A protein has these predicted regions:
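Hydrophobic/aromatic-enriched cytosolic interaction surfaces used to assemble or bind macromolecules
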Residues: 1-275
Length: 275
């Protein structure tokens, strides 16, 4: 499957642009933009054929679209919904990160990576399939691998710092959710769950809400991610939680261009770091 980029993005100008490739279980998406140029943001979804080997689909997309191998200012590889764990900075040891990830998740025989969570004084450790990691490392120029949780935490923390109440954030993906809790800028909960139907999400959210001792009268639930799923969940949860907010994108994101309207928040957050 071959597809083109904007006429503005050519191989001789590619070093002015930042590319982010978002890997997910059923395909990938990518964005390309120039941090110095307003409304230059381009975003595209690429679904993979069902039942086909993931690495075969990935290779086909890369080989049929040579712009993936161009020299960019920076290349990010976002690993979406991959297994992860968070380790306090004082307990983190590089040599043991694979053992810890295997012990705490189902990430067996995966290449182990980590991202620094500066504001949380912790490391996020995650796994990616060896074949996928090796192929991306060979095919892309100096790629930076980042878990999708990593770039959204600073945004959520900032929102929490401006609130006196506890806040529970729910990030809705196609087959999984991230639940993240903050209290005045301090991370108090983070975990991800797979789901098959909306009722599963309702159970996880209400269970975490109760376990965190959150107040129906003063604390807030914020939903973001898949728009239709957010609307459906809001209709159900408003019978249980008084303050529910559908989280929009940061106002500065609109400077990137109209494609941000269909872009996951983790990609946007990573892009805003470069502005």
């Amino acid at each position: 499957m071959a597809f083109g980029l904007s006429d503005k993005i050519t191989i001789d100008k590619s070093e002015n642009y930042i590319m982010s490739i978002r890997l997910r279980s059923d395909g990938l998406s990518f964005s390309v933009y120039n941090p110095s140029e307003k409304e230059s943001f381009l975003y595209k979804e690429v679904p993979f054929e069902r039942g086909r080997n993931y690495i075969s689909s990935l290779k086909e997309i890369f080989f049929e679209n040579e712009f993936f191998s161009w020299h960019y200012k920076k290349v990010n590889v976002i690993c979406a919904s991959y297994p992860y764990t968070i380790i306090p900075k004082e307990l983190f040891q590089e040599k043991y990160k694979t053992e810890i990830l295997t012990f705490t998740t189902s990430a067996v025989e995966k290449h182990c990576l980590s991202n620094v969570l500066t504001n949380e004084h912790a490391e996020l450790v995650f796994g990616i399939e060896d074949e996928v990691y090796e192929f991306c490392s060979r095919s892309l120029v100096n790629p930076y691998f980042v878990h999708h949780i990593t770039p959204i935490l600073p945004l959520l923390r900032k929102l929490s710092c401006n609130s006196l109440s506890k806040q529970l954030f729910v990030n809705l993906h196609r087959q999984s959710i991230d639940i993240i809790g903050y209290a005045q800028g301090s991370l108090i909960f983070i975990n991800s769950f797979e789901y098959k139907q909306t009722e599963d999400i309702v159970y996880y959210v209400l269970y975490v809400w109760k376990q965190m001792g959150m107040s129906q009268q003063s604390d807030q639930l914020s939903l973001f991610g898949d728009p239709s799923a957010c609307q459906d969940l809001n209709k159900i949860l408003k019978d249980y939680i008084q303050y529910i907010k559908l989280l929009g994108m940061p106002s500065e994101a609109y400077l990137l261009g109209t494609d941000v309207l269909q872009t996951p928040l983790d990609v946007i957050a990573l892009s805003l770091c470069e502005l």
